[in-house]
């Protein structure tokens, strides 16, 4: 397994991983700023979080002495993101039940 990882590292440099992560983050940020549907905005935020996870794992893999710390932090971030999505989608569902819309522009008041 270690030999396979070393072969992949020889083929794909750190800049390749960082470029993919930057593109993922940019797409997520663009979608979160442009789209008005709350569910799509949540998906874009998750894409941004996964771009950060990719960066963290790439640096942990390429830096000597990092060990499995990058993967450990990534698992923690994924667990926190799952909880964030559960709470966020519950809020969106509650808003949809009262307002009959998930459009962010139409839900601008905190009153019921």
From Swiss-Prot:
The record's listing under InterPro entries reads:
NADH_UbQ_OxRdtase_chain4L/K (IPR001133), NUOK/Mnh_C1-like (IPR039428)
Question: Where is it located?
Answer: Cell membrane
Topological category with respect to the lipid bilayer: Multi-pass membrane protein
Q: What is this protein called?
A: NADH-quinone oxidoreductase subunit K
Which reaction equation describes what this protein catalyses?
A: a quinone + NADH + 5 H(+)(in) = a quinol + NAD(+) + 4 H(+)(out)
Q: Pfam families from the entry?
A: Oxidored_q2
* Membrane-crossing residue ranges in chain numbering: 14-34, 39-59, 76-96
Q: Locate the coiled-coil region(s) and give their ranges.
A: none
Instruction: Give the encoding gene's name.
Output: nuoK
Reply yes or no: does the keyword Lipid metabolism apply. Answer: no
| GO annotation terms (biological process) | ATP synthesis coupled electron transport
Which lineage? Bacteria, Bacillati, Actinomycetota, Rubrobacteria, Rubrobacterales
**What GO terms are given for molecular function?**
NADH:ubiquinone reductase (non-electrogenic) activity; quinone binding
* Enzyme class, broadest EC rank: translocase
Its family remark reads: Belongs to the complex I subunit 4L family.
Where does this protein come from, organism-wise? Rubrobacter xylanophilus (strain DSM 9941 / JCM 11954 / NBRC 16129 / PRD-1)
Q: Name one GO cellular component term.
A: NADH dehydrogenase complex
Q: Transmembrane: is it a keyword of this entry?
A: yes
Keywords, sorted A to Z: Cell membrane, Membrane, NAD, Quinone, Translocase, Transmembrane, Transmembrane helix, Transport
Annotated HAMAP family: NDH1_NuoK (MF_01456)
What's this protein's function?
NDH-1 shuttles electrons from NADH, via FMN and iron-sulfur (Fe-S) centers, to quinones in the respiratory chain. The immediate electron acceptor for the enzyme in this species is believed to be a menaquinone. Couples the redox reaction to proton translocation (for every two electrons transferred, four hydrogen ions are translocated across the cytoplasmic membrane), and thus conserves the redox energy in a proton gradient.
Give the EC number(s) listed in the UniProt record.
7.1.1.-
Q: Which domain of life is it from?
A: Bacteria
Assembly and binders: NDH-1 is composed of 14 different subunits. Subunits NuoA, H, J, K, L, M, N constitute the membrane sector of the complex.
